[in-house]
Structures are given as structure tokens and as C-alpha cells.
Swiss-Prot record:
Pfam families assigned to the protein according to its UniProt record, in alphabetical order: K_trans, K_trans_C
Main subcellular localisation: membrane
Keyword list, A-Z: Cell inner membrane, Cell membrane, Ion transport, Membrane, Potassium, Potassium transport, Symport, Transmembrane, Transmembrane helix, Transport
GO molecular function, one term: symporter activity
Subcellular location: Cell inner membrane
Keyword ATP-binding appears in the UniProt entry: no
Species per Swiss-Prot/TrEMBL record: Burkholderia vietnamiensis (strain G4 / LMG 22486)
Membrane topology: Multi-pass membrane protein
InterPro entries: K+_transporter, K_trans_C, K_trans_N, Kup
Superkingdom as given in the UniProt entry: Bacteria
Segments crossing the lipid bilayer: 24-44, 64-84, 113-133, 151-171, 182-202, 225-245, 261-281, 299-319, 351-371, 381-401, 409-429, 433-453
Coiled-coil regions, chain positions: none
Classification lineage: Bacteria, Pseudomonadati, Pseudomonadota, Betaproteobacteria, Burkholderiales
Protein name, per record: Probable potassium transport system protein Kup
Length: 637
């Protein structure tokens, strides 16, 4: 009886685990695979663009489909799903998390560490270059289905695209938790639909299945040489969104993402691309829009609607990714403080960054109006994706060797294959710089300059502050030996360095000549891991006389919370804190550019402007504005 009960419990636990895994996989399909899942809308059409001069013969169709197939297998199926997703930072993926992991065993002052940091930041910047193109090309290519379904409405493609995009960004501030539950089932329907379309056309031209043989890809490259290399720049469009598999790993876990990819997403994509190839072999004129021309006439409008919804979901994933990346970059010190709002009390990862939201919308609308069609925009797409892919491969190699201590020869062999593929795609996309590739490169380069300027500027400010600083604990001992007038209440001094006296305390003593009976020096520190356990978050030192030095550690995926820190500190020290009875003292730094060693004067002016426009600490740390005392200080850099 006991054995039977144990067996039943084990079976129940296994069933529950399987159900949970399937639920996570469906949720992942709605968030992770939107971008790569909507690539069939434009990828094959762009590969046979008239500008490439590739004839629509049977051999070239088989060759291009073979290239698409092996690109998906090698980059998505093997590189990302089997190798890169192993390189997680405490479960978190993405280029910044990977950069933080690769830097962990290195001295931050070495050139290697500096180069890896610059690579990681550039990869993050290129993500933003991708983030402004994905919503534009995805939504536009879906709405362009109207040109096939109802040609007399073709003049409405641009206005409808603009309205959809404005609506999408407008609802961001309200959060997407409610509609987000529908994303998974809708995208499952999308993948089933595109797979069914593919199967129908493959059944009519079974010969297309021969494209599985890599001989056709190699033969196509050999026959067309330079033209074929140019086509590689379009083939990479089937991989847009592959980085999301890794970047969103922290939300869903590696197993559900792999289950979704191998179980539904990759088979559906392959079937659809092969179906489009079969259609072209039967009717080369279908190159006008092979995706929508796969559908029977009665299904065209429903397919346009479904594809539009799917592209909105894909865009949502990119937008959410931009918020998350910005939040990580703020915590790691690469971006000025910005207002970050949490749109859900239950889901930690659901945030909204107003500045990023409206900047993205402004740039995306300019792109849509400027490029006018998905065909024109396709040339701009790909270069940001491939640049990030190359950077991810390099950082993953460093992690394999330096963090995991894998055999260098083994890592070299694996990475050589991946880099050969990545650099091949990247080189092919460099050929498209003049046609539109300049756009993501320009956006990425501008952001890289701003982020590196901010990081360097903050480093200089810290050096200047440390050089002029006074050690905190000896100062406090002297203060207690000759105390100023003590006043009732609690004072909290926010400081960036728990070893030095806050400038705000010096100013308060100089001008007001008082010290509160309970004084706390609070420092927030961001670790190179995504989350810090609650029991490891706080450390404190009692300096005596009601003076406490408190350090709160957060991961780069977390947002510092003053109220929560005070509550936790109060619990461990048998104290109570009322925010409205507490005074917060902050130093308001004014950065003054000078000719001192550091950065060139014009970069210092850019940094000073960024510093001046960063979100106020009161907004960022959610401190009641009427409880804050700001004391000004000038820092020459």
C-alpha cells in the first residue's frame, strides 16, 4: 500500500511538473518567439529581391531554402539552444548579463576587461538599433497583406501601420499583464497556421524537401558567388529574434524555451519556409508576396488580421526587452538614472520606462514614414542582429574558458564554427550599409558614445570624490567624542561610498550644526548577478551613539527600494521607521567641466548635460519629495 501511495505521489508530481513546463513553454512562445516567428512575412521575399539579381529557377529556390534551413538549424537549434543558453548568469541571459559574467574572474582595470565591457555595451546598444526596426518592419509587413487581400485599400497601409504603432506604445504605461495571458495561445495559433500553410504547399511540390540536403546551399553559393553572399544578408532575416531566446531566459528558464523551440517553433518555421519555396517552384510570380499568396482567397483577410496581431505581440516583446535592458544598464551604472515604473504588483519583470517608450515611438514613426515599405526597411534589418550575435559568441567563449574552465582546444573548435557563420552573416550585412544598414549602426554608435561617456564620467566623479573624501568611521568617532547638538528624529544620508563621509553630512554640520539622534548612512550597491537573496541583502555596522552604516545589495535586475530596506533594518534592530517622520539628506552634485585630466572638454560637457537631466534620486528611489533635504556640491572633472 505504501509503495502504491509513493508511486501515485511520484506520478502526480511528475504530471504537475509536466503541466507547469508546458504552461511555461506556451507563455514563452508568446513572448520569446514573436520576432523570429513573424520572419516568414518578409524573409524569403527579400532574399529574391530584384536588387540581388537571383533568377527564380528551381536550383536557386532549392539553394536559398537550404540556406534558410541550415541557418535556423546551426544558429538557433545548435548555437543558442544548446551552447549559449548554458552561459547563464544565475539563470539570467542577455548580452549585459553575459558581459557581467565574463568580467567576474577578471581585474576590472585590465585592458581585457575594458575590451569585454566595451563589447558588451556595444552589443546592448545594437539591441536598441534592432528594437526600432522590429516593430516597424513587422507591423508594416503584416498590414501590407491588405495589398493582396484588398488591393483597393493599399493606400491605407502606411496610416494603419502608424495608428497600430501609436496605440501599442500608448498602452504601455498601463502594463500588458491582462492581454499578456493571451499572447501564448495566439502565437501557438500563429505557428500552427503557418505550419499548415507550409504542409499544404509541400504536399503539392514534394521535391522542395530535397533542400534539407546542404549540397543545394553549397551549390547555390558556388554558382552565384558575390550575388549569393549578398543574399546571405537577407537569409539572416530568418534569425531575427534568435537573441531573444537567450535574453528572455531569466523569465521562463532554459527548459521551457527549448521545449517550445524544438517542439513547435522550429518545425513550424521550417515547414512554412519550405512551403513558400514549393509555391515559388510552382508559381515564380508569387515572389510578389509569397507568404500571403500561400493562403487560399477565403483565408487571406483572417491571415492578415492574425499576422498583424502576431507582429504586435512580436513588437511588444522587443519593447519589453528594451525596458528590461535599460533597467539593467541603469543598475550597472552605464545609463543615467531614469524613472522606472512597475506595472504589475505580481510580476517583478513588468516595468515601464517612459523616456525609453516615447523615444522608441518617435524614432519608429520616423522610420516608418521615411522608408514607407517593408521592402525598403529590410535592407536596414539584420546588421544589428548579426553584430549582437558575434558579440554574444565572443563573450560566451570567454565564459567557457575563464569561468567554466573548459578545454581551450574544444572551445576554440566550437567557437570557430559559430564565429565563421556569424561573421559571414555580419559581413554580408555590411554590404547593405548604404541601403539602410547605416540606420541601426548609427543608432548603436550614438548610444555607445553616450553610454561610454556616462560610464567614464561617473568613474571620474568617483575618483574626484574619493580623492577629496574623509574616512567615515574615524570621523564619526571624533564626532561622538565632541558631539554637536543632537535633535530628535531620524536622518538618512544616501551615499555612494560607505567608507567616506557624505558631503551632505558635512554641509549639514557646517550650516545647521546639528546631528539627529538616529542617523543612518545608506549605500546601495549593484552586484554582477541578477538577484540578491533577501537574507544576503543587508549588512550594517553600529558606529555607536545611534549612528549606523548600512549597505543594501541588489542584483542588476532589481530596483532599489528605500522603504523595504528600512523595514528590514528595523526588523533586525527592533526599530520602526515612518517615512513621513524621516529626513533624507542628499548631495546634489553639479558637474563642472574643466581641463583637468579625464575626458576631452566637449565629452565632459555631454556628461554634465546627461548628469543634469538624470532622474532625481527622490523619483528613482521613491522617496517622498517633502522629506528630502538636498545640499549642493560642485565637482570639477
Amino acid at each position: 500500500m505504501n509503495d502504491t501511495t509513493q508511486a501515485t505521489d511520484a506520478a502526480h508530481a511528475h504530471s504537475t511538473h509536466q503541466h507547469s513546463m508546458q504552461a511555461l513553454a506556451i507563455a514563452a512562445i508568446g513572448v520569446v518567439f514573436g520576432d523570429i516567428g513573424t520572419s516568414p512575412l518578409y524573409s524569403l521575399k527579400e532574399a529574391f529581391s530584384p536588387a540581388h539579381g537571383i533568377p527564380l529557377t528551381e536550383s536557386s529556390i532549392l539553394g536559398v531554402i537550404s540556406l534558410l534551413f541550415w541557418a535556423i538549424v546551426l544558429v538557433v537549434g545548435i548555437k543558442y539552444l544548446l551552447f549559449v543558453m548554458r552561459a547563464d548568469n544565475n539563470g539570467e541571459g542577455g548580452v549585459l548579463a553575459l558581459m557581467a559574467l565574463s568580467l567576474r574572474p577578471l581585474d576590472s582595470k585590465t585592458r581585457v576587461a575594458g575590451a569585454l565591457m566595451a563589447l558588451g555595451i556595444f552589443g546592448a546598444c545594437m539591441f536598441y538599433g534592432d528594437a526600432v526596426i522590429t516593430p516597424a518592419i513587422s507591423v508594416m509587413s503584416a498590414v501590407e497583406g491588405l495589398e493582396i487581400a484588398t488591393p483597393h485599400l493599399s493606400h491605407l497601409v502606411l496610416p494603419i501601420t502608424i495608428v497600430i504603432l501609436i496605440a501599442l506604445f500608448w498602452i504601455q504605461r498601463h502594463g500588458t499583464a491582462m492581454v499578456g495571458k493571451l499572447f501564448g495561445p495566439i502565437m501557438v495559433l500563429w505557428f500552427v497556421a503557418i505550419a499548415a500553410l507550409g504542409v499544404y504547399h509541400i504536399s503539392r511540390v514534394p521535391g522542395i524537401v530535397a533542400a534539407i540536403n546542404p549540397y543545394y546551399a553549397a551549390s547555390f553559393m558556388a554558382d552565384h558567388l558575390l550575388q549569393a553572399y549578398v543574399v546571405l544578408g537577407s537569409v539572416v532575416l530568418v534569425l531575427t529574434g534568435a537573441e531573444a531566446l537567450y535574453a528572455d531566459m531569466g523569465h521562463f528558464g532554459a527548459k521551457p524555451i527549448r521545449l517550445a523551440a524544438y517542439g513547435l517553433v522550429m518545425p513550424s518555421l521550417v515547414l512554412n519556409y519550405f512551403g513558400q519555396g514549393a509555391l515559388l517552384m510552382q508559381n515564380p510570380k508569387a515572389i510578389e508576396n509569397p507568404f500571403f499568396l500561400m493562403a487560399p482567397e477565403w483565408a487571406l483577410l483572417p491571415l492578415v488580421v492574425l499576422s498583424t496581431v502576431a507582429t504586435v505581440i512580436a513588437s511588444q516583446a522587443v519593447i519589453s526587452g528594451a525596458y528590461s535592458l535599460t533597467s539593467q544598464a541603469i543598475q550597472l551604472g552605464y545609463v543615467p538614472r531614469m524613472k522606472v515604473l512597475h506595472t504589475s504588483e505580481l510580476a517583478i519583470g513588468q516595468i515601464y520606462v517612459p523616456v525609453v517608450n516615447w523615444l522608441l515611438l518617435a524614432v519608429i514613426l520616423c522610420i516608418v514614414i521615411g522608408f514607407k515599405s517593408s521592402d525598403n526597411l529590410a535592407a536596414a534589418y539584420g546588421i544589428a542582429v548579426t553584430a549582437t550575435m558575434v558579440i554574444t559568441t565572443v563573450l560566451a567563449a570567454v565564459v567557457m574558458v575563464r569561468v567554466w574552465n573548459w578545454n581551450r582546444l574544444l572551445v576554440g573548435a566550437i567557437i570557430a564554427v559559430f564565429l565563421a557563420v556569424d561573421l559571414g552573416f555580419f559581413g554580408a550585412n555590411l554590404l547593405k550599409v548604404a541601403q539602410g544598414g547605416w540606420l541601426p549602426l548609427g543608432i548603436g554608435a550614438l548610444l555607445f558614445f553616450l553610454l561610454m561617456t556616462w560610464y567614464k564620467g561617473r568613474h571620474i566623479v568617483k575618483e574626484r570624490t574619493a580623492a577629496d573624501g574623509i574616512p567615515l568611521e574615524p570621523f564619526l568617532q571624533g564626532l561622538l567624542a565632541h558631539p554637536p547638538h543632537r535633535v530628535s528624529g531620524t536622518a538618512i544620508y544616501l551615499t555612494g561610498n560607505d567608507k567616506l563621509v557624505p558631503v551632505s553630512l558635512l554641509h549639514n554640520l557646517k550650516h545647521n550644526k546639528v546631528l539627529h539622534e538616529r542617523t543612518i548612512f545608506l549605500t546601495f550597491v549593484t552586484r554582477d548577478i541578477p538577484y540578491v537573496r533577501d537574507d544576503k541583502r543587508l549588512s550594517s555596522r553600529d558606529a555607536g551613539g545611534g549612528l549606523y552604516i548600512v549597505k543594501a545589495e541588489y542584483g542588476f535586475n532589481e530596483t532599489p527600494d528605500v522603504k523595504a530596506v528600512l523595514e528590514e533594518f528595523g526588523r533586525t534592530h527592533d526599530m520602526t521607521f515612518e517615512l513621513m517622520d524621516t529626513s533624507f539628506f542628499l548631495a546634489r552634485e553639479t558637474v563642472v567641466p574643466t581641463h583637468l585630466p579625464g575626458m576631452s572638454i566637449w565629452r565632459e560637457r555631454v556628461f554634465a548635460w546627461m548628469h543634469q537631466n538624470a532622474a532625481k534620486p527622490t523619483d528613482f528611489f521613491s522617496i517622498p519629495a517633502n522629506r528630502v533635504v538636498e545640499l549642493g556640491t560642485k565637482i570639477e572633472i
